[in-house]
């Protein structure tokens, strides 16, 4: 039985979204059980034989500064959910709450894996191959060293191997051009480290990739700093929404275009489904001594259910053990521990 702790109070909508999503998830996964963390008065109406309520009296808001979330709200639903993972009561935690707070609390309670300096958020962006490109970091670290980018590549490779079933996923380094001579000093050095790791058989380095390659599916994994990754994520979601809106606008211009819309409905429906970012919700916080997944704060029921499913798949397929094994084997490439740079603030996802 896979047990997931759910921060039911987090996000823009709280229990109005998380509870229905939890019910849908349980209906589809007979070997899963949920620990619903939150204020009892907000969760009291929910009843399921494979769900248990865990009381938490406080809520971390989307605007709470780190000091408040980490030091003052010690009985927040977010913190209590992560505590379940630390205590072994759950194999993974899921929250749609404040990203910076989630990362800080997760690092404080779970600690980072040996050989990892900074956890990273790994998310998915749909591509032209009908799959998804895994991008990391997506907002945890706005400044990264070359060693950090190598660590991200190692962790991302383990993630895609486990969740996508690819034995040797390709890794691309996001750059302003494909040539090795392009990019700043951090990117150039990261390229050297990734090529060395690839020659040693520790990962499958494709080479430098550009922004459009994310959507082409040129590489299974794209590594970058959290600032760039977060911008790419939000840009892709905005583009998908704009395309759908444009189609609606054009097909509603006249009686003739409305008839055309009826004829084209199956194609439009399939396109909309492939571009639906809700199906790719759920970013993994990689590099921790426990599994934590971040849902979009604005997630609806379907999106939050997908985040729960990704956490379930990760726990069922022993993602944490796979990441630990890969890092332990490859850590000598960056001297056992990546060299640190001044810590960057998290970018809310």
Curated annotation (Swiss-Prot):
The keyword Acyltransferase does not apply. Its EC number is 2.3.1.274. Gene3D superfamilies: Isopropylmalate Dehydrogenase. The keyword Iron-sulfur does not apply. Signal peptide: none annotated. Pathway: Lipid metabolism; phospholipid metabolism. One of its GO terms (molecular function) is phosphate:acyl-[acyl carrier protein] acyltransferase activity. It comes from the Bacteria. Catalyzes the reversible formation of acyl-phosphate (acyl-PO(4)) from acyl-[acyl-carrier-protein] (acyl-ACP). This enzyme utilizes acyl-ACP as fatty acyl donor, but not acyl-CoA. Belongs to the PlsX family. This is Phosphate acyltransferase. It comes from Albidiferax ferrireducens (strain ATCC BAA-621 / DSM 15236 / T118).
């Amino acid at each position: 039985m896979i047990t997931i702790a759910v921060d039911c109070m987090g996000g823009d909508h709280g229990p109005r979204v998380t509870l229905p999503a939890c019910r849908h998830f349980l209906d589809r996964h007979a070997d899963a059980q949920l620990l619903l963390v939150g204020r009892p008065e907000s969760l009291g109406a929910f009843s399921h034989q494979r769900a248990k309520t865990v009381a938490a009296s406080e809520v971390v808001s989307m605007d709470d500064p780190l000091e408040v979330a980490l030091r003052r709200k010690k009985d927040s639903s977010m913190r209590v959910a992560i505590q379940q993972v630390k205590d072994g009561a759950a194999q993974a935690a899921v929250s749609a709450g404040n990203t910076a707070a989630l990362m800080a609390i997760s690092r404080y309670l779970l600690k980072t894996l040996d050989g990892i300096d900074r956890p990273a958020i790994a998310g998915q962006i749909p591509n032209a191959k009908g799959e998804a490109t895994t991008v990391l970091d997506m907002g945890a670290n706005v400044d990264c060293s070359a060693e950090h980018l190598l660590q991200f590549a190692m962790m991302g490779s383990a993630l895609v191997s486990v969740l996508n079933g690819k034995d040797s996923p390709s890794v691309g380094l996001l750059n302003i051009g494909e040539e090795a001579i392009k990019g700043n000093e951090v990117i150039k050095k990261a390229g050297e480290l990734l090529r060395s790791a690839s020659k040693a058989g520790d990962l499958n380095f494709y080479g430098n990739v550009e922004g459009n390659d994310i959507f082409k599916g040129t590489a299974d994994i794209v590594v970058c700093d959290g600032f760039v990754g977060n911008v790419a994520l939000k840009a892709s979601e905005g583009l998908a929404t704009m395309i759908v809106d444009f189609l609606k606008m054009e097909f509603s211009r006249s009686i003739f275009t409305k008839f055309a819309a009826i004829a084209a409905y199956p194609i439009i429906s399939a396109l909309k489904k492939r571009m639906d970012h809700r199906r790719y919700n759920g970013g993994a916080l990689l590099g921790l001594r426990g599994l934590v997944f971040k849902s979009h704060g604005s997630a609806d029921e379907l999106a939050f259910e997908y985040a729960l499913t990704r956490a379930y798949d990760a726990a069922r397929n022993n993602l944490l053990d796979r990441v630990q094994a890969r890092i332990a084997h490859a850590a000598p490439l960056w001297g056992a521990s990546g060299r640190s740079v001044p810590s960057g603030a998290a970018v809310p996802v």
